[in-house]
Each structure stands twice: as structure tokens, then as C-alpha cells.
UniProtKB/Swiss-Prot annotation:
This is Holliday junction branch migration complex subunit RuvB. Keywords: ATP-binding, Cytoplasm, DNA damage, DNA recombination, DNA repair, DNA-binding, Hydrolase, Nucleotide-binding. GO terms for biological process: DNA recombination; DNA repair. The keyword ATP-binding applies. Its EC number is 3.6.4.-. Its main location: cytoplasm. Residues 264-355 are annotated as: Head domain (RuvB-H). It is found in: Cytoplasm. It comes from Burkholderia multivorans (strain ATCC 17616 / 249). ATP binds at L29, R30, G71, K74, T75, T76, E137, D138, Y139, R180, Y190, R227.
Length: 355
């Protein structure tokens, strides 16, 4: 069986960071203020108002929950919020905060109006989450000192602060935690024009020469995700410097991305393998997830969490009660004739009428 977690992490079009080295590149390319932030106009407009109002009142910004698919800029927005408010940012993640004391240590070291950013906040343990509730509401925490009969609860006052939580799984947040966020913002996938502007800005920061058509070609294959766009830009830049004169044109971008097995709609080998299995091995579906996993040699979780979301979001795949089904868009993409709509796929449980 293929090591799916490792394989998913190494995909050129994966929306999660591939390595700590890539995170360094991301930090260098991040916009530093809202005026430089491309896309998410509704969220950006709301934050501009809320931040300005909080600054005028000299109060901390209300607690902010950012949710949406990975790679859309949640961490970037957290850093921008802190910078626009003129305060410090402390960053951690849900899995790191294993004990109540871990969170208490962070909270007690915050200065007035600081921002505490918790990534993957849906993965907080229940014990840590309980400590967080009074901190969010009253800027106080209760900690236990001592053990056994001598143990006692001590209430500690905290400086006013802003919690910015980020998650790709908003549905996994408990209701009490979700209700404590005054500002809730969903980040959406970017369109090609927005991504093209991001690519051109990043190219300028990387001192890469790119024309608008080259930027658009990269943008169209970036699956609506800035992180993927910036990763593809770096690889296309490498190709342009070695195989051409360093100028990224549409033709150079197309050749570089073809070399990377990224097709015109942003599919890679794994996407195509899944869709072609449904088309050719299961006559377009429906096919159960376990049968599909066995057919392509991938884990069920990898299909559900890594491969399917983008294919469903773009209309290439449907989940039905009977299994996964390829759409007409998928048939067109692979240059195949779609089945007659009046000829439903027969299930193994269907029986012919008695003669």
C-alpha cells in the first residue's frame, strides 16, 4: 500500500505546507497589511471596520474565528490583524496545547490587547478548552494549585486580548467555543484574476520576470488557492531560468506545469487516477468508497480528505447514497462521450423483471 500521508504532502498542488522550508518562503511573501491583501473582499472590508473601531475605542478587537479550506490565508490574516492593531502576536496550534498549563502560560504572558493565534483550534483538548472559556469572556483563568485534599483553585486576572482561531473544520468546533467568537469569517476559494494578481506580486518579491499571461496561466492551475499559486510560481521560475531566458510567459508556464503533471484545470496524477478509475473501471459510477480505494491503491481517508473536496467543489465528482459518480464535466475533460441520461447504471442489487 502506498504511504498516502507522505504522498499527499508531496503533491505539488497540495494546499498544506510541504515543509518548514516552504513556510519560510510563505512568510517572506505574506502581505503585511490589509491594503496589500488580495481577494476575500467581504472579509477584508469587515475587518477594516472592526479594527478601526477597536483602535478608536482603545479596546482589544473582538475574538475572531477564521475558517475555510487550507492555503487561503488564515494565518496571514491573523498576522495582519496584529500588525494593524499595533500589538504583538503569539502563535500556537491546537495539538500543541496538550495541558491546561500550556495555555495558562501563554495567556499570562500576553500584554494588553495582544493577539493570540491558535491554528487548528478544532483540535483543542476538552481540558484546555474549559480553561479558555473564562479567559475569553472575563479575561480570567482558574488554575489548580497543589494536589489531593490540599488542592485549591486560584483565579488569575489576564490582560485584555484577542483570540484569533483558525480551522479547516468549523463543524468540529463545540458550540460553547464557537459562540464566544464575536467575529466569524469564512474564507472562500480565489478566482483566476485574484490569483493572477497574487502571482504577479509574489514574482516581484522574488525578483522573477513574469508577464500577465504567464501569471494567469499559473493562476488557472492553482485550484483557487494562493499557497498553491506561490508554490507553482517558484517551480515555473526554476524552469524559466534553466530552459529559457528567465522570462515567465504563458508558453513557458504551460511547459513547466506540463512537466510537473499539472493539467489546465489544476489536476495532478492522483486526481486523474481517481477520476479515470471511476470512468473506466466502474463505468462512471456509482462506486463505493472502499472499492474505489482498492482500485487506485489509496487509503479511504486520503480520498475523502485530500482528493475529493476539490473535485466535488469544481463539479467533477458527485457523492450519492449509492457511491461516487463522475459528472458530465469529467467526461468532457477526458474527451469521452457521456452515457445516455436515460440509461441508469445498474446496481448488482438490481434484478431483472421476472419473465
Amino acid at each position: 500500500m502506498i504511504e498516502t500521508d507522505k504522498l499527499a504532502a508531496e503533491r505539488i498542488i497540495a494546499a498544506t505546507p510541504a515543509s518548514s522550508h516552504e513556510e519560510v518562503f510563505e512568510r517572506a511573501l505574506r502581505p503585511r497589511q490589509l491594503d496589500d491583501y488580495v481577494g476575500q473582499e467581504k472579509v477584508r472590508g469587515q475587518l477594516e471596520i472592526f479594527i478601526e473601531a477597536a483602535k478608536r475605542r482603545r479596546e482589544p478587537l473582538d475574538h475572531v474565528l477564521l475558517f475555510g479550506p487550507p492555503g487561503l490565508g488564515k494565518t496571514t490574516l491573523a498576522h495582519i490583524i496584529a500588525r494593524e492593531m499595533g500589538v504583538n502576536l503569539r502563535q500556537t496550534s491546537g495539538p500543541v496545547l496538550e495541558r491546561a498549563g500550556d495555555l495558562a502560560a501563554l495567556l499570562t504572558n500576553l500584554e494588553a490587547n495582544d493577539v493570540l493565534f491558535i491554528d487548528e483550534i478544532h483540535r483543542l483538548s476538552p481540558v484546555v478548552e474549559e480553561i479558555l472559556y473564562p479567559a475569553l469572556e472575563d479575561y480570567q483563568i482558574d488554575i489548580m494549585i497543589g494536589e489531593g485534599p490540599a488542592a485549591r483553585s486560584v483565579k488569575l486576572d489576564l490582560q485584555p486580548f484577542t483570540l484569533v482561531g483558525a480551522t479547516t473544520r468549523a463543524g468540529m468546533l463545540t458550540n460553547p467555543l464557537r459562540d464566544r467568537f464575536g467575529i466569524v469569517a469564512r474564507l472562500e476559494f480565489y478566482d483566476a484574476d485574484q490569483l493572477s494578481r497574487i502571482v504577479q506580486r509574489s514574482a516581484s518579491l522574488l525578483n522573477a520576470q513574469i508577464d500577465p499571461n504567464g501569471a494567469l496561466e499559473i493562476a488557472k492551475r492553482s485550484r483557487g488557492t494562493p499557497r498553491i499559486a506561490n508554490r507553482l510560481l517558484r517551480r515555473v521560475r526554476d524552469y524559466a531560468e534553466v530552459k529559457a531566458d528567465g522570462q515567465i510567459t504563458a508558453a513557458i508556464a504551460d511547459a513547466a506545469l506540463a512537466m510537473l503533471d499539472v493539467d489546465p484545470v489544476g489536476f495532478d496524477l492522483m486526481d486523474r487516477k481517481l477520476l479515470e478509475a471511476i470512468l473506466h473501471k466502474f463505468d462512471g459510477g456509482p462506486v463505493g468508497i472502499d472499492n474505489l480505494a482498492a482500485a487506485i491503491g489509496e487509503e479511504r481517508d486520503t480520498i475523502e480528505d485530500v482528493l475529493e473536496p476539490y473535485l466535488i467543489q469544481q463539479g467533477f465528482l458527485q457523492r450519492t447514497p449509492r457511491g461516487r459518480v463522475a459528472t458530465l464535466l469529467t467526461y468532457r475533460h477526458f474527451g469521452l462521450a457521456a452515457p445516455d441520461a436515460g440509461s441508469p447504471v445498474q446496481s448488482i442489487w438490481d434484478t431483472p423483471d421476472a419473465q
